[in-house]
């Protein structure tokens, strides 16, 4: 029978899932809801990436590049449901054919629930994954953070009468001075003050004999000239202009698959992973290569390549959009160290890392066992001392 399971067999299919995010262009901001700053894409792909095409610009130079996707996974996946944040219209997005991805705009990070439903021949229940969408870079950036000038410093200037301005902290200022920033008009002493909305008519004259009108005139006299910031916004750092990749590798394992489903899997073997990356390892390596001039044949600089991308985010990115690029724990990988392609080298590295972790766990277990034995001996000796003391 086709539904009979083949015992003692496990078949795996490698996948990668995660998110890609970048700043909105000015044109995209006009179409996006108010307050949205980023465009993001959550995806599920096969682990292997397609090979680079000769005579065409490298795909990783496209600012909307996604890793993986060499294989069509519809031969065993019936549909993928991405459950977004409830504030989005139709938060449950069902994708029933490749590519399995959802693109939206937003301003905040949240966790996406991913539900994978397999074809009926698999006789398997739906699988569940989750991924936290990353909108901001973390860890050490690819270049040093730009020096940000401080807040504008008030520059004192002399008044027209060249007299020293004295501040009276104990003098109650009229209410309209704190509400309405417009300067107060100086009136002659004989002219009565008009009743303005919000004026403090019941305030008694302050000590020293100064009238309220005199205080208004003194406050209205400009004593400080504030240097306004430049109308030209500061340019975004390179780290802010680069996209944010956040993805992880996983394997869908089928144990004792039905005969019919096993035949389907055998008819669609996964594309082998490359031994080494055919693309730059990560954004940091790509930046260093461009900085040293090693990639002149394919584009000269990060800015030039981004201008050639379909999104064009670098040229049209909105200045003033928040672009965090904070330094993380020294030595810890950051967003600039996320690989652009999954390879056998990475697979072996993860395997070796797991072996090293296992060795460290065994070493720690041995140390704790030795300590436990020593403490048990100390406890037994203490009990003997207590018995000897009680017998005396």
Swiss-Prot record:
Identify the domain of life: Eukaryota
**Annotated segments matching region Disordered:** 146-213, 263-330
Q: Which InterPro entries match?
A: YEAST_sf, YEATS, YEATS_dom
Q: Does the keyword Cell cycle apply?
A: no
Q: Where in the cell is it found?
A: Cytoplasm; Nucleus
| Coiled coil (residue ranges) | 357-392
Keywords for this protein: Activator, Chromatin regulator, Coiled coil, Cytoplasm, DNA damage, DNA repair, Nucleus, Transcription, Transcription regulation
GO CC terms of this entry = cytoplasm; NuA4 histone acetyltransferase complex; nucleus
Low complexity composition bias: which ranges? 296-314
Record-annotated YEATS domain positions: 5-268
| UniProt protein name | Protein AF-9 homolog
Annotated GO molecular function terms are: histone binding
């Amino acid at each position: 029978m086709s539904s009979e399971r083949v015992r003692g067999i496990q078949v795996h299919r490698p996948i990668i899932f995660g998110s890609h995010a970048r700043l909105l262009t000015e044109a995209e901001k006009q179409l996006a809801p108010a307050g949205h700053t980023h465009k993001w894409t959550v995806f599920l792909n096969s682990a292997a990436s397609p090979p680079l095409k000769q005579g065409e610009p490298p795909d990783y130079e496209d600012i909307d590049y996604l890793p993986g996707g060499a294989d069509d996974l519809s031969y065993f996946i019936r549909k993928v449901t991405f459950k977004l944040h409830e504030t989005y219209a139709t938060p449950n997005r069902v994708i029933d054919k490749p590519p399995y991805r959802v693109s939206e705009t937003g301003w905040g990070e949240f966790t996406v629930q991913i539900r994978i439903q397999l074809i009926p021949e698999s006789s398997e229940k739906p699988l569940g994954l989750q991924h936290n969408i990353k909108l901001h870079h973390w860890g050490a950036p690819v270049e040093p953070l730009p020096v940000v000038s401080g807040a504008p410093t008030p520059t004192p200037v002399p008044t027209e009468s060249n007299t020293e301005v004295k501040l009276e902290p104990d003098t109650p200022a009229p209410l309209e001075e704190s509400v309405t920033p417009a300067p107060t008009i100086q009136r002659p002493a004989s002219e009565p003050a008009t009743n303005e909305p919000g004026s403090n008519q019941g305030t008694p004259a302050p000590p020293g004999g100064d009238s309220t009108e005199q205080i208004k005139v003194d406050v209205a006299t400009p004593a400080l000239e504030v240097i306004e910031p430049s109308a030209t916004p500061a340019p975004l750092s390179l780290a802010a202009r680069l996209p944010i990749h956040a993805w992880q590798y996983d394997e869908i394992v089928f144990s004792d698959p039905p005969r019919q489903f096993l035949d389907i899997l055998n008819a669609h073997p996964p594309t082998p992973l490359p031994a080494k990356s055919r693309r730059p390892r990560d954004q940091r390596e790509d930046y260093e290569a461009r900085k040293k001039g090693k990639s002149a044949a394919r584009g000269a600089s990060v800015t030039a390549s981004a201008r050639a991308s379909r999104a064009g985010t670098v040229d049209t990115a909105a200045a003033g959009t928040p672009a965090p690029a904070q330094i993380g724990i020294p030595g810890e990988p950051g967003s600039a160290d996320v690989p652009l392609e999954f390879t056998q080298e990475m697979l072996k590295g993860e395997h070796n890392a797991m072996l090293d972790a296992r060795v460290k766990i065994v070493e720690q277990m041995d140390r704790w066992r030795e300590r436990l034995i020593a403490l048990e001996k100390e406890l037994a000796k203490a009990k003997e001392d207590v018995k000897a003391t009680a017998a005396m």
